[in-house]
């Protein structure tokens, strides 16, 4: 009878600790107020970079169709119009172009959908 009483005394504190521990740990976690939609929108706009587009049904039934980042080609023209009415074009001075290209480290990236070595527009 003493053995049953002794084992009960050992199990009772263990059971109490197991029952109380989840409740205590829930009190220790910091409670954060709910985020308003305006704050969430500002946080999304403040994030750098862009998010990948959905490539669902973009690769002509090729699977897996995945969004990847690819370098984009510069869109600026190397020729400028002299007179809009004359239709003539002139190349800008090469020294100006060289200076601008020399110090430019901007490498624009864009998104494409990729599947089996082929690229598709998202």
UniProtKB/Swiss-Prot annotation:
- Write the record's keywords in alphabetical order, separated by commas: Developmental protein, Disulfide bond, Secreted, Signal
The signal sequence is 1-26
Q: Which GO terms describe its biological process?
A: guard cell differentiation; stomatal complex development
The entry's localization annotation reads: Secreted
Q: Which cysteines are joined by disulfide bonds?
A: 55-113, 59-65, 62-115
Q: Which GO terms describe its cellular component?
A: extracellular region
Q: Does the keyword Signal apply?
A: yes
Protease as a keyword?
no
Protein function: Controls stomatal patterning.
What protein name is recorded for this chain?
A: EPIDERMAL PATTERNING FACTOR-like protein 1
Species source reads: Arabidopsis thaliana
């Amino acid at each position: 009878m003493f053995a049953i009483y002794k084992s009960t005394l050992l199990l009772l504190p263990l059971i109490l600790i197991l029952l109380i521990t989840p409740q205590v740990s829930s009190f220790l976690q910091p409670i954060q107020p709910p985020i308003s939609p305006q704050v969430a929108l500002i946080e999304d706009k403040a994030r750098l970079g862009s998010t990948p587009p959905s490539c669902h049904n973009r690769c002509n039934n090729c699977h897996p169709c995945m969004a990847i980042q690819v370098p984009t080609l510069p869109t600026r023209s190397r020729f400028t119009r002299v007179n809009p009415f004359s239709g003539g074009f002139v190349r800008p001075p090469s020294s100006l172009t060289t200076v601008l290209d020399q110090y430019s480290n901007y490498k624009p990236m864009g998104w494409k959908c990729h599947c089996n070595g082929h690229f598709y527009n998202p």
